[in-house]
Amino acid sequence: STVISLADTGAHCGVLCDASVPTQMLSYYVRDRQRGHRLALETAVKMQTLDTARCVGLEDRGTLEVGMKADMNIIDFDELQLEAPEIIFDLPAGGRRMFQGARGYVATLVSGEVIMENGKYTGAVPGQLIRGPQAA
């Protein structure tokens, strides 16, 4: 499956956090793995971008090229690392969820606007809700 973390999304947020899968893939399976096969960086990026977009019917995303919609993470690959998981209580009625932060993400851009910079929200909210497949 190209979309590892879409199964059961949110159903068990108090006991696991699969949002860490992309960071784990890049930091361990691409960069740090000592035994067994390492993934090529290009392969991992393709799995997390183009393959995932196609899997969910988003033909207008997944690559950085003219005419395509693209959000982008700028990553300091050498500093990329997961932080220790923690339980936080920020859901309605004080509900708990597992949270796992990461270091090494320099910036995240959505629709050309920086929404995260060095792990901090900028307050920008340029994204939009999309429904169903999107043609290129």
Across the structure, where does each feature detected by a protein language model lie?
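Compact recognition or signaling/catalytic modules
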Residues: R103, P133-Q134
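Residue-level signal for alpha-helical context at structural boundaries
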Residues: G62-T63, A70, P85, L91, ...
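Ligand-binding pocket scaffold of soluble enzyme catalytic domains
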Residues: G62, A107, Y121, L129, ...
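Short, low-complexity, polar/charged sequence segments that are solvent-exposed and flexible
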Residues: P22-L26, L91-R96, G127-L129, A135-A136
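C-terminal cap of metal-dependent C-N hydrolases
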Residues: T2, A7, I74-K120, A124-P126
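Generic surface-pattern signal
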Residues: R31, Q134-A135
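His/Asp/Glu-enriched, well-ordered alpha-helical/loop segment
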Residues: S1-E79
